[in-house]
Every structure is written in C-alpha cells, then in structure tokens.
UniProtKB/Swiss-Prot annotation:
Residues 1-66 form a transit peptide. The keyword Aminoacyl-tRNA synthetase does not apply. This is Phosphoenolpyruvate/phosphate translocator 1, chloroplastic. GO terms for molecular function: phosphoenolpyruvate:phosphate antiporter activity; triose-phosphate:phosphate antiporter activity. Phosphoenolpyruvate/phosphate translocator that transports phosphoenolpyruvate (PEP) and dihydroxyacetone phosphate.
Length: 408
C-alpha cells in the first residue's frame, strides 16, 4: 500500500521546495492546461445549448430581463383569466348557498301553508259533522283511530323509525296521553256547542293557563312584562264572550277546560322529563300518545255514548251516510296531519317563531270560519277577538326575554 506522502496527501518532512505557481497556458489544439501538466479540459467545438433560452425566459419572469411586449400581453391575459375564474367560482359558491337558502325558505313556507290548510279543513269539516251528529266522544275516538292507523302505517313502512321505549317510559307517557285525550275531547265538545270562531277566541287564553300552571307546579315565575301581556288576552276574550251571538256556557267551559288540559300536558312533559331515545322524536312521541289515547277513550265511548257511528244509527237519524263518513275521515286525517306538520315546523324554527305562527294560524282559522259559516260578528266582538290575539302575539314576544341574573 502506498503511503500518504506517496499519494501527495502529506508533505515529506523537511521538504522546502515551493510549489510552482499555477498559470493558464495559451490554448492549444490539445485543450486548456494548467501549469505543466496535462490539459485539464479536452478540446471541444462550441455549440449552442437549449438551456440558454429557458434561462432567459426565467430571468424575464423574475424581472432580471425585461419581457417582450408579446410576452407581457400574454402574462396580463393569463392573470385576467385567473381573476375571472376565481370570481366565477366565488359567484358559483354564493349562488349555491343562496339557492340552498331559497329552497329551505320555500320548504318552510310550504309547511306553514299546509299547517294552516289542514287546520282550516279540520275545523270546517269537524264543525259540519258535530252540528248534525252531536256525539263528540265518538267523533274524537274516530280521530284517534285514524291517527293510530296512520302511525302504524308509517312505522310498518319505515317512514318513521319504530320507537324503542321501555315500560318506564310508557308509564311516564301515560299521563300525557290522558290529558291529551281530554284536551281534544273538550275541544270537540266546544265546537259542537258554539261557533268555531268563538271556540278559538277562548283558546287564545292558553298563555294565561300556561303562566298559571308553570308558576304553581314548576315554580317558574313570570316577568312583570309577561304578566302585563296577559291583560289584553283576558280582556279581549271577556269582551268577545259578552257579545258572542252563539254563546252558551257548555261551549264556553268546554273550551276553557281544553285550555287547562293542554297546558297541563305541557307542564307534565317538563315535570316528568320523559327520556327520549334516538327514535323517540316529537313526531314519534305524538304518534305514541295518539295510539294510547285511542285505547284510553275507546272504553269511555262504550260506557257513555255507545258506538254511534254505525250505518244503522246514522240512517235512523236521517243523516247522509256518505257525507258523514267522508267528512269525518277527512277531519280525522287533517287533525293528525296538522299536528305532525306543526312538529316538523318546530324542528326547523325557534319556539318563539312557532308560537307566532300559531297565533297567525288562529287568526286564519277564525276569519275563514266566519266567512264560511257566515257567522254574525258585531264590531265589539271583532274588537275583543283582535285584542285577545294581539295579546297572544305580545306574550310570545315577551316570553323569549330572559330576566337578567341578579348579581351580588
């Protein structure tokens, strides 16, 4: 093996000779040489490289060399195209969002329209049947029966997910079903005795009973503004009652009892706090309550009025069998449909918006029934109804204002 000194990595000790200075010789046919050694580079002919143009273009791109007018125009057109494309993309996204928002608005408007339409048809057909067939327990049970069939159909077909509830949950739902049954029964009893418009005017007092029962059983004390909003409600209902042409005490107290039972249902639902599974949303809970209400009211029907919806009973009373059955079934379908649509709306909007929509719905039902049945209405009666409904609207707005927490 050669030593490091042999290969020139180390100078031999004591060597004092200095290296000859490097100098570049004149080019020779053999190439460029350094010092006295062999030529460093072999001779090659000169040729153009393709790298040079790219280097020039790169230099122009970074501004080292000015670009030609054609290249500058091309660059501007490219930048303009990119800007146009970005603007179009942003506009497309905004348009998609706007289109999605418009679709949701139209869908919500359609649901409100169906809610009002089903309510109108229910009240009109229900009133027509109750006027000639004064058996409100039978009619109410028919409505629960139709609702039960609809609920079972939706569960069997998979439109609604089958509920998975325990015995404890059924026991908690039972009181809700009981007051739900009584509330609808009292409403039908009132509709059979007085005008539709008057029943719904009395039912405008629901906020009064809601505040009263919540304070008594839940300890929820209302704000002074909420209490003040109840004054026009009570005053308007009183004024409308004094001037109501169809007034009778049975219809009046039935509507009042309906208010108490429906608001008791709301208080019970808060107090019992029914634990919901994933498959137990509001629509499913309403369907379960409807089925339970049918089985609760069926024996009561047998023990009180008896089964009066048979063809024999209807024909003996001189009633048109086809008309009674058709209108009863339409009213029952609309009864179940408008409550389902109401829950669908509640899932999309805030409770305050829903309560305002409910107030408007009551106005629509009152006006429609007055026009359809040609109910005589005096100016004082109209004023009382209007004041009561205005109070309901004011209540719904003030209810959302939460009292500020007291600081120490």
């Amino acid at each position: 093996m050669q030593s490091a000194a042999a290969v020139g990595l180390l100078r031999p000790c004591g060597a004092t000779t200095a290296a000859a200075p490097l100098q570049l010789r004149n080019p020779s046919p053999r190439g460029f040489g350094v010092g006295v050694g062999q030529p460093l580079l072999p001779p090659r002919g000169l040729r153009l490289s393709a790298v040079a143009p790219r280097a020039g273009i790169s230099a122009r791109r970074i501004g080292l060399v000015p670009a030609s007018p054609e290249q500058e125009d091309e660059r501007r057109r490219g930048a303009r195209d990119v800007a146009v494309a970005a603007t179009a993309a942003a506009a497309g996204e905004a348009g998609a969002e706007e289109g999605g928002g418009l679709a949701k608005t139209l869908q919500l408007g359609a649901l409100f329209g169906l809610w009002y339409l089903f309510n109108i048809y229910f009240n009109i057909y229900n009133k027509q049947v109750l006027k000639v067939f004064p058996y409100p327990i039978n009619i109410t049970n028919v409505q629960f029966a139709v609702g039960t069939v609809i609920a079972l159909f939706m569960w069997i077909t998979g439109i609604l997910k089958r509920p998975k509830i325990s015995g404890a949950q059924l026991a908690a739902i039972l009181p809700l079903a009981m007051v739900h049954t009584m509330g609808n029964l009292f409403t039908n009893m009132s509709l059979g005795k007085v005008a539709v418009s008057f029943t719904h005017t009395i039912k405008a007092m629901e906020p009064f009973f809601s505040v009263l029962l919540s304070a008594l059983f839940l300890g929820e004390m209302p704000t002074p503004f909420v209490v003040l909003s109840l004054v026009p409600i009570v005053g308007g209902v009183a004024l409308a009652s004094l001037t109501e042409a169809s007034f009778n005490w049975a219809g009046f107290w039935s509507a009042m009892a309906s208010n108490v039972t429906f608001q008791s249902r709301n208080v019970l639902s808060k107090k019992l706090m029914v634990k919901k599974e994933e498959s137990l949303d509001n629509i499913t809970l309403f369907s379960i309550i409807t089925v339970m209400s049918f089985f609760l009211l069926a024996p009561v029907t047998l023990l009180t009025e008896g089964v009066k919806v048979t063809p024999t009973v209807l024909q003996s009373a001189g009633l048109n069998l086809k008309q009674i059955y058709t209108r009863s079934l339409i009213a029952a379908f609309c009864f179940h449909a408008y409550q389902q649509v109401s829950y669908m709306i509640l899932a999309r909007v805030s409770p305050v918006t829903h309560s305002v929509g409910n107030c408007v719905k009551r106005v629509v039902v009152i006006v429609t029934s007055v026009l359809f049945f040609r109910t005589p209405v005096s100016p004082i009666n109209s004023l009382g109804t209007g004041v009561a409904l205005a109070g309901v609207f004011l209540y719904s707005q003030l209810k959302r204002l939460k009292p500020k927490p007291k600081t120490a």
